[in-house]
Each structure stands twice: as C-alpha cells, then as structure tokens.
Amino acid sequence: MTLFASSVLLAASLLSVPSQARTLFKYERIQLTQEYLDTLPQEDAQLFAFEDKFVAAPNKTATRCRYFPDDGKWPSDKAWTKLGKQLSSVDALIKPVPQAAVCYPGPIQDDVKCKQLTANWTNSYTHISDPTEILSPVYQGLTCQPPTIYNSGNCTLGGYPSYVINAKTVLDIQLGINFARNDGVRLVIKNTGHDFAGKSAGAGSLSLWTHNLKDITFFDKYVDDSGYTGPAIKAGAGVQAFELYKAASDHGVVVVAGEGQTVGVMGGYIQGGGHSPLSSLYGMAADNVLGFEIVTATGEFTTANSTNNQDLFWALRGGGGGTFGVVTSVTVKAYPEMPVTAASWSFDSTKIGKDRFWAGVRAYVDHFIDNVSNSTYSYFTISPNGNDVTFRMQPFFAPNKTLNTASNLLQPHWTTLTRLNIPINPKLTQYKSFYDAWQAEFPLEPQSDVQTAFGSRLFPRSNFESETGRNISFGALKDSVNAGQIIIAFNMAPALARGGNPDNAVNPAWRNSILHAITGRRWDVKSSANDILAARKSFTNGTMQKWRDVTPGSGSYLNEADRLEPNWQQSFWGNKYAKLLGIKRNYDPKDVFWAVNAVGSEGWTVESFDGLPNENGRLCMVNETISTTTSRMRAMEEPTPVMVV
Ligand SMILES: Cc1cc2nc3c(=O)[nH]c(=O)nc-3n(C[C@H](O)[C@H](O)[C@H](O)COP(=O)(O)OP(=O)(O)OC[C@H]3O[C@@H](n4cnc5c(N)ncnc54)[C@H](O)[C@@H]3O)c2cc1C
Ligand SMILES: *[C@@H]1O[C@H](CO)[C@@H](O)[C@H](O)[C@H]1NC(C)=O
Ligand SMILES: *[C@@H]1O[C@H](CO)[C@@H](O)[C@H](O)[C@H]1NC(C)=O
Ligand SMILES: *[C@@H]1O[C@H](CO)[C@@H](O)[C@H](O)[C@H]1NC(C)=O
Ligand SMILES: *[C@@H]1O[C@H](CO)[C@@H](O)[C@H](O)[C@H]1NC(C)=O
Ligand SMILES: *[C@@H]1O[C@H](CO)[C@@H](O)[C@H](O)[C@H]1NC(C)=O
Ligand SMILES: *[C@@H]1O[C@H](CO)[C@@H](O)[C@H](O)[C@H]1NC(C)=O
Ligand SMILES: *[C@@H]1O[C@H](CO)[C@@H](O)[C@H](O)[C@H]1NC(C)=O
Ligand SMILES: *[C@@H]1O[C@H](CO)[C@@H](O)[C@H](O)[C@H]1NC(C)=O
Ligand SMILES: *[C@@H]1O[C@H](CO)[C@@H](O)[C@H](O)[C@H]1NC(C)=O
Ligand SMILES: CC(=O)N[C@H]1CO[C@H](CO)[C@@H](O)[C@@H]1O
C-alpha cells in the first residue's frame, strides 16, 4: 500500500514541473517599504506614502487641473529636494534643460555646440539618450528646437517635464509615483521617446525615465503556468531592440520585437501590441509575453502573469503604455535562431511614366495574401517627389526561408515587372541568422520632422480577396500618394497560424489585417496655428476618412497613429475597450497615469498654450466631466483616514 502510494506521488511530481519562481533583477529588489516610511518624520512620510496607507490632503487631487509650476500649489523646492534625497542615487532627480538651449540667448548659449547639435539633430540617438527629448517634436510644442530647423524665438520647456527621475531602481519609481499622486503633480513616463503622439512628454510633469533599466536574463527552460515550457528572456524596461536582439543572438534564440533599432521593446512597444519582422510567424510581441513586473498607481510593486493579477496581465498585452502602471521588466518567449532571406528593390516613375509605375505597384498588392501565408513581412514606401513617384521595398523579409524558397516567392513578381518593362535591380541575400538579417536590412530611422502629422490604418485580408476589393483598396492608397502624401506600409499577418492567438488586449483589427499603412500630411513650416489646424482637419477627416471608408469596422495601430484619431477607443481596441476601461478604473481610479488617447483618458485634456494638439500646457479635467469625476474622487477619499494629524 505504502509503496504504491509513494510511486504515484513520484510519477505525479515527474509530470508536473514546478513553475518558475519570481525572478527579480537587482534593481527590482531595491524597494520602498512601509517600515522605511515609518522611520521618516511625518511630513516626509506624507510625501511618499503609499495610496492605501495614507490619503493626500483633502481636495488636492480634486482640483480641475494638475498643479503647475508657479500656480501656488506646486510642491515647494524643499519638497522636491526631499524627493531627490530619497532616490537611490544622488543625481537621479534632474531639472531638465532642453538640449537646444545652447542655441538661444541665455547662460549656456554656445555657437559651436549649437552647430554640432544641429548637425546631429535628426539622428535618433541624440534624443533617446536625453532625459526629456522626444522623437515627434511637433507634440512637444516645438519650443527650443535648433533655430535653423525650427526657430521657436526663445527656449522654454514647452511640453517637456519640469522634473525627471532617472530611475535606476523600483524604489525610485515608487517614490516618483507616490510623490506625484500625493501632491497633485502630473506624472509621465519616458522610455525612448519614440511615441508618435508625444505620450512620453508633458508640461508641468514629473517624468519617470526608464531608459537606464537595461538588465537582461536568459532562461534556458522557463516553466509557465499557462502551459509554456521553453526558452525565455527577461529584459528591463529600458532595453532597446538592438540590445535585446544581440542578447537573444548570444544565446542562439530570437524574440519578437520591432524593426526599428532604437525602439524601447518593453515599454510602449510591447504594451501597445508591437509588430515585428517575425509577426507573420509568431504574432504580435504582446502575444509572446509571459509576465510583467510593475509598479501600480498605489505605489505597490507586483507581478502580472498568467496566475497573478490576471486582468492586469491581459490589459498590459496590447492596452497601451503609460496607462496601468510603470512596467519595470518583461519576460517573453524565445525561439530557436533561424536563417532569413531578405530582398530589396525599387523603381520610380521618372522614365517609365505613372501608368506603368502604378501597374508595377498593383502587381505586388495583388499578392499580399499569398506572401504573408508564407510567413513573410514586407516593409515598403511609396513616396511622391514633385511629379514623380518612387516605390521602395526595404526589405522583403522571409524568416526561416532559404535563398531558393524566397526566390521562388518573388520571381513571379520580378518577371511581371520585366514584362511591364520596369527595370529593377533586386538584391536578394540569405543570412544565417535573424540577427544578421535584421542588422543588415533595417537602417537607423531618423527623428521625425517639425511639420508633419501622421495617421495609419489596418487593412483587412478580405479587402484583398476579390478584384473589386483590391481595386478599391489600391485606389485609396494611390489617391493619397497622388495628393502628395508618403505611404509607409507593412504587409504582414500577425495572426498565429498554429495554436491560435492568446486572449489579450491586442487590437482585434490586427488579427485579420494584412496591411498596416501609415501616411502623413506635411504643412509649411511657417504656417500659423490656424493653418496647421486646418491642414490637420483635412488630413484626419479628409484623407484618413477615405481609408476608413474602405476598411469599415477595422482600426488603427495605437502606437503609430494620428493624435487626433476620431473614435479612438473603437479604432485602437475594438470590442475590447469596455473591459480595458474596467481594468483601468480598478487599478487607477484617480488617473495617476494619463496619456493622450490612452484607455480611460477621456476625462482629461492638455490645454495647450497655442491651441494645437500637443503637450505644451496644463493637464486639466474636461469641463463637462468635472462635477462627476470630482464627486467620484471625494467618495473614494473619504473612508480611509489612517494617519491622524
Ligand atoms: C523609428 C521608429 C520605428 C518604430 N518601429 C516599430 C516597429 O517595428 N513595430 C512597432 O510595433 N512599432 C514601432 N514603432 C512605434 C513604437 O512601438 C512606439 O513608438 C512605442 O510607443 C515606443 O515605445 P517606447 O517605450 O520606446 O517609447 P516612449 O515614447 O518612451 O513611450 C511610449 C509610451 O509608453 C509609455 N511607457 C514607456 N515605458 C513604459 C513603462 N516601462 N511602463 C509603462 N509605460 C511605459 C510612455 O509613457 C508612452 O506613453 C516605431 C517608432 C519609431 C519612431
Ligand atoms: C474642499 O472642497 C469642498 C467642496 O468643494 C470645499 O467646501 C472645501 O472648502 C474645500 N476644502 C479645502 C481645504 O480647500
Ligand atoms: C555629433 O555628435 C557627436 C557626439 O555624440 C560629435 O562627436 C560629432 O561631432 C557630432 N557631429 C557633428 C557633425 O557635429
Ligand atoms: C517665448 O516666445 C513666445 C512666442 O514668441 C512668447 O509667447 C513667450 O512669451 C516667450 N517666452 C519667454 C519666456 O520669453
Ligand atoms: C507569477 O507571479 C507570481 C508572483 O510573483 C509568482 O509567484 C509565480 O511564480 C509567477 N508565475 C510564473 C509562471 O512565473
Ligand atoms: C523552419 O524551417 C524548418 C525547415 O523547413 C522547419 O522544420 C521549422 O518548423 C520551421 N520553423 C518555423 C518556426 O516555421
Ligand atoms: C509574393 O508576391 C509577389 C509579388 O506580387 C508575387 O509575384 C508572388 O507570387 C507572391 N508569392 C506567392 C507565394 O504568392
Ligand atoms: C478593377 O479595375 C480595373 C482597372 O481599372 C478594371 O479594368 C476592372 O474591371 C476592375 N474590376 C472590378 C471587378 O471592378
Ligand atoms: C473631425 O470631425 C469630427 C466630427 O465632425 C470632429 O469632432 C473632429 O474634431 C474633426 N477632427 C479634426 C482633426 O478636425
Ligand atoms: C474650462 O473652464 C474653465 C473655467 O472654469 C476655463 O478657464 C477653461 O478655459 C475651460 N476649458 C475649456 C477647454 O473650455
Ligand atoms: C513554402 C510555402 O509555405 N509556400 C506556400 C506559399 O504560398 C502559396 C500560396 O498561398 C502556397 O501555395 C505555398 O505552399
């Protein structure tokens, strides 16, 4: 009897592999504790208190706007100094100065430095390594740009934050969140600043800068309760694509991340969904997440994975950055390295004329479905230049395909182009690994300019199934180019062929889409605010409406979208929005985290100084919602008087 029982036990323990214990980076083990707060003078403890332990002074967060420097309610210099002293390193609290201050009258004006900065301005590294700069300066409000690029007259902070915490530990993040929440200060998170809509900036804010959280750990065999057993990588919130791909390659694996070299993988990218050169094979980056470590709005540091905070885990995989908390690290699945073949080619209308040019483009569009069914990803642009138009494939990316197979995929197209008498000089290369292919094929992308608005649309597979559908979709794209707009597009299918897609917050429109197309409208750099608004209106409600009209019920990718996207809740999340909003209300009822067009952001708006859509102003409640929101906040504040003053 006894023998029998123990052998059953043994068999059971062999079958059920124990799941992974919580593995924290060193910087995640340095945390703020209640025990520590209890040792501080009460006045200081109040500044940094956790939400469930202490409630801010009455009415503080119930004012119409977040406090702003010089409004009389902004925390005193003394309070900021106290914050600085509690952080894990002495220089972690930064009072930012825009880089281009060297170009304007003032104490640090320096013509030589200004020239160097101007020469380097469009290089994205110039901005990523800075605590406040963002890659879409239009949404910072265009103050303090190098004058030969955009003369802003003087150098003010504009949409940049008032203070930045260069976060090096979980402690720093907890202190920042608690301080901002308790003192009515707007909070923003900047990782790399790649966000298309300026979500990583904000005037009069305290910014948590996650860029330096760079740790990476590899697991040979990660065991997750969701059923996954296999290689995995845990990476810090500040890890960028070039660093993650290198680390993966060092261990002979690949991970699903973006094409851009400098994008911050574990910040806005993965939380917003994340498309990848591997998406037609492995889905969206968010589909591959096993767990997040996160500091929530209360200041608590916790895990969101398949067994812990499951609702938060669901929301963080596609629900968008800057909304539910500050993620400190993410664990993702990894897959074996594979060979990749990539191709690039281009042609333009100069010698062949527009009709042949468009016939060549059309021959490619006609095969979108066939190509992605072979797990390929292609990245192409169609750019007008005066009377001419250029098509550039850069690159066509065929993961796990040999030169021969990839050549078979493309040869029919090249034959068609030859038949159309369109000269091309294609380059086809087989790489031994994804890492080599990615490094060689994707150039460093520049910072975006000071006079363009971008928008995007997901085009469903069904649009390309019939000739009528292809005519209509192709017509809409062609019309935009003929109207002078560039198209930057991706042919991919991030629907998992094998095993189905995990249930998460990724925009359902991605699942049946095979084209993600981005376009932009430029305006004259000297345009008045009114002219810019008019140009934007005709872009958002004119051109982009034509794309919406041919893709009814679909949506747009929130990470590469128009800041003025109408009906963004449906567009970015479709039928998942209601559930996301419920999770937001539950984890962040006081809107400690706010970003434009983020889940639950409806009640607030940035009142910019120039009336343009940007971060250059106070964050205030939308007037109609004040009374209800305020009473909701008061109701929440009342029942928790823990400390007696
Ligand atoms: C050149 C370029 C190439 C790109 N390539 C791709 C691509 O291949 N695939 C793709 O899907 N997208 C791509 N994007 C879009 C990209 O996904 C978004 O710009 C994304 O927001 C970048 O995230 P980030 O953290 O680097 O940027 P940031 O601008 O720093 O942050 C973006 C948002 O996430 C929030 N956030 C950042 N870190 C955290 C955190 N730790 N916790 C919580 N919230 C956080 C910020 O507050 C902000 O709201 C590209 C963008 C650019 C400019
Ligand atoms: C708090 O708000 C209530 C209602 O608006 C007001 O009557 C009260 O005077 C405020 N208290 C403080 C300290 O501002
Ligand atoms: C760009 O910046 C680098 C330092 O990051 C500097 O060495 C270089 O001179 C700058 N380039 C130009 C053209 O000034
Ligand atoms: C900066 O210039 C703008 C526009 O000319 C002006 O409105 C603003 O008052 C100036 N700010 C400062 C601090 O001089
Ligand atoms: C999920 O998170 C909890 C809490 O950190 C942890 O105990 C558990 O092991 C995690 N599960 C997996 C599979 O990692
Ligand atoms: C890659 O190709 C090999 C050989 O054709 C195949 O066995 C393997 O399943 C492929 N991997 C993926 C992820 O498709
Ligand atoms: C891929 O697209 C090209 C260009 O349209 C086409 O010629 C080719 O047939 C497609 N591949 C497959 C497998 O259909
Ligand atoms: C598609 O467009 C072509 C060229 O304009 C036209 O000849 C063809 O009849 C159209 N097909 C359908 C089904 O509308
Ligand atoms: C587009 O039209 C809608 C509805 O008329 C309007 O609310 C919105 O402000 C317009 N968008 C822009 C950018 O003008
Ligand atoms: C909201 O109301 C306040 C006064 O209560 C006013 O100053 C502000 O301009 C209004 N904001 C908008 C966007 O109408
Ligand atoms: C290798 C491979 O998957 N080839 C497929 C490419 O797509 C065409 C059309 O869908 C299929 O017929 C091939 O089998």
Predicted regions and their residues:
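Soluble FAD-dependent oxygen oxidases
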Residues: 22-645
